[in-house]
A protein has these predicted regions:
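Conserved N-terminal phosphate-binding loop of PLP-dependent enzymes in the Aspartate aminotransferase
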Residues: 1-435, 439-446
Length: 446
């Protein structure tokens, strides 16, 4: 029988030592009105908590584990590397090898800098854009999350959306004034802004596939508009592919939609589950970074051999067997088509949105194209779906504003089990809707 007694005790203790008991807000389960399971181990498509519950995992550490948890080849490479030392603070051959592999997947990244997190990657890319153009203003889109640096915590998605906070206290007004926000997928708003002040803008930064208000793909022509206006006005186009890199396709969203950005930020999969991210782009731009140029960026643990080893092993597997990308996308398609079929069977209004191997179930009857659309979805129905699945061994992101992910370890048996539990959840929601309609009709008759 499903129970979380040990996890609840562990959470109470954690709250004495960490803000809210967690090290990233969405993990607190506050948005679904419960307490989180504390995870003890993971393998393949499964994770296990300290209460001995087993789950089929669609969070996958928020995206990185495309090969599944504890991939034997990745683990073996780490076991071999660790005895040689965990950090040198000096150049290694591994860094160059990783840069070569990243460039092979994404040729737009001619020169690459390794950092420790997606936040560092986007923060550094913005500094490079400002230094290169000599301009201060940046454009981002409402609901797109680019990490927690001050300039980008303005109308962000992800955890901020989960907690209903449009902006974070502690971001100086002077910093926020240089961040212009527009609705995602609104090409007309982009054109108008650039017609008015385009020559003062350093860069547009965008999730080419939004993943932090749920999975929201770009509308036809949207990314093309961004590329067109930035080129016309001497601004840079930055693709934040921290989430959708290696998910949208083998070459990320830029390959899937055939758009070449000036700078790209990658994380998650590129580190194979270790703290590693990269940013890179055109040689002329990246060579403005110290020591090649005047724009400063540095990090004590950047390029540390353990994280680089994990990333190198992961990308080597993906490079050796490119069919992995089709396999995970095919599994995601089967899963999403199953969700749509079951929801329709029980008359539950649902829109399932997918790009590559990332997906979100939106409890709404219309496509989600931007943050306002995402925010109008039915959160109570999401909570019902989430809790039924969790208690029956299916682990989804505990927020309606997040993407879920599929790995190479999610085989047909996992998909079948997932859909069987989803069938029960949608039936429960459908029955609730039916009873609600019956009650309304009774009230009308009275």
């Amino acid at each position: 029988m499903f129970q979380l007694g040990k996890s609840e005790k562990a959470f109470e203790e954690a709250k004495r030592y960490m803000p809210g008991g967690v090290n990233s807000p969405v993990r607190s389960y506050r948005s679904v009105g419960s307490n989180p399971p504390f995870i003890s181990s993971a393998s393949g498509s499964r994770i296990y908590d300290i209460d001995n519950n087993e789950y089929i995992d669609y969070v996958l550490s928020w995206g990185p584990m495309i090969l599944g948890h504890a991939n034997p080849e990745v683990i073996a490479s780490l076991q071999e590397a660790i005895p040689r030392g965990t950090s040198y603070g000096a150049p290694t051959l591994l860094e160059t090898e990783l840069a070569k592999k990243v460039q092979a997947f994404m040729p737009s990244m001619e020169v690459i800098r390794l950092v420790n997190s997606g936040t560092e990657a986007t923060m550094s890319a913005l500094r490079v854009a400002r230094g290169y153009t000599g301009r201060d203003r940046i454009v981002k889109f409402v609901g797109c999350y680019h990490g927690h640096s001050d300039a980008l915590l303005v109308k962000a998605g992800s955890g901020l959306a989960t907690f209903g906070v449009p902006d974070s206290p502690g971001v100086p007004q002077g910093v926020a004034e240089n961040t212009i926000t527009l609705p995602y997928n609104d090409s007309d708003a982009v054109r108008k802004l650039f017609d008015d002040i385009g020559d003062t803008i350093a860069a547009i930064i965008v999730e080419p596939v939004a993943g932090n208000m749920g999975c929201v793909p770009p509308e036809p022509g949207f990314l093309e508009t961004l590329r067109e206006v930035t080129k016309a006005h001497g601004a840079l186009l930055i693709f934040d592919e921290v989430m959708c890199g290696f998910r949208a396709s083998s070459g990320g969203a830029q390959k899937r939609y055939n758009i070449k950005p000036d700078l790209t930020c990658l994380g998650k999969i590129v580190g194979g589950g270790m703290p590693l991210a990269v940013f890179g782009g055109a040689r002329e731009i990246m060579n403005q970074i110290a020591p090649a140029g005047p724009i400063y960026q540095a990090g004590t643990l950047s390029g540390n051999p353990i994280a680089v080893t994990s990333g190198l092993a992961t990308l080597s597997i993906l490079q050796r067997d490119p069919t992995i990308f089709k396999q995970v996308e095919d599994a995601t398609i089967a899963l999403c088509e199953g969700f749509e079929r079951l929801a329709a069977q029980y008359n539950v209004p649902v829109v399932v949105q997918r790009v590559g191997s990332m997906f979100t179930i939106f409890f709404t009857d219309k496509p989600v194209k931007n943050f306002d659309d995402a925010a109008s979805c039915n959160e109570e129905q999401f909570k019902m779906f989430f809790h039924h699945n969790l208690s029956h061994g299916i682990y989804y992101a505990p927020s309606p504003y997040e993407s879920n992910f599929v790995s190479i370890c999610h085989k047909s048996s996992e998909i079948e089990r997932t859909l069987a539990v989803a069938d029960e959840a949608f039936k429960k929601i459908g029955d609730t809707l039916k009873n609600s309609d019956t009650l309304k009709n009774s009230d009308t008759l009275l």
